[in-house]
């Protein structure tokens, strides 16, 4: 015992270290489950339990986050949530702090899309150096779409207006439903076997995520990637993005835009625009993927150090204290009510009217003292919370940013505090109160 006394933990230290381990190793996770024990106290925070057939976990979603949820959760509802594991140290319980919540159906499609996107990116299907430029003199375009849809009408109209000399060969296919992805793959393979066109235009009109789901097929992604013919993906509206857009050689926001990219005017401007747009898109996608990974890392680091997390702990603890006080008051009043009934019964048996008056006054006095004590306790708790929030706000880096200051870091995420550390051409990142600015050093001036 003497040799191990330095390894003896306090309860607070143990809970704190468990919290650091869980938060540090798991990070952000997706969780699917059924809601139970849902409650929404006056603070606006949500507390609930997610469970499956054999296990459950406590969850909290604070007011700033749950305002973005488009529906009101109810017990028994299946949902998909994204959040981070944390430990509520005062009680030693681990819980999930929810950041976003979706109904189980839509959420699973979005999660499957993100997972497939990451997998294909890791396999190199989105790499910019694999993208093929469009042919310089396009004579025949193979259009892979439904022959009766609005997309083919838009494509034919644009081509007839811009370059009537272009010949169009339609490879009819399904563009929606369970067998649509297989049908599209077959059409692409047929076009590659015949080699009768210069380029392929894969297109359909807009729709919901479920309507466009066939264009998120892994098999279709590999078919496009292995195509000997260049492929332009023009699926949905401008806001719709599919896996076929990422893996195709060029992505057009709409069917009409795809037809414009493949048709030339007298100055051949469309061809030049398509090449420039392709390079820009691939560069932007590469940069986006890189920044998404970096942002995820920064969010994880900020989450571990964010003073808002501590404030949320205080708010959750305050909610629990308030519920306990309300419960204690209710129990106490119930006990007093039973006691009053007992006294009344005894008085009715003995008819001592003066004792009834004395006990009634004493009961009123006790109720008044109990109410005063409850109010004092609530006031003290509110003052402690406000004081703690103020202390956290004074040391928060976000408070500094809100006063007009900014924080500039280099590419290694090191704070830049002197021009001695800079050279012309360095890339800098400046964090503002709302957003950030990416800049390049073009001139260095010493402080005069």
From Swiss-Prot:
Q: Name one GO cellular component term.
A: cytoplasm
Reactions catalysed according to its record: Exonucleolytic cleavage in either 5'- to 3'- or 3'- to 5'-direction to yield nucleoside 5'-phosphates
Q: Which GO terms describe its biological process?
A: DNA catabolic process
| Pfam families assigned | Exonuc_VII_L, tRNA_anti_2
Q: Where in the cell is it found?
A: Cytoplasm
Keyword Hydrolase present in the record's keywords: the answer is yes
Under Gene Ontology molecular function, one entry of this record is: nucleic acid binding
Kindly state which keywords UniProt assigns to this record, in alphabetical order: Cytoplasm, Exonuclease, Hydrolase, Nuclease
| Record function comment | Bidirectionally degrades single-stranded DNA into large acid-insoluble oligonucleotides, which are then degraded further into small acid-soluble oligonucleotides.
Instruction: State the family it belongs to.
Output: Belongs to the XseA family.
Q: Which NCBIfam families match?
A: xseA
* Protein name per its UniProtKB record: Exodeoxyribonuclease 7 large subunit
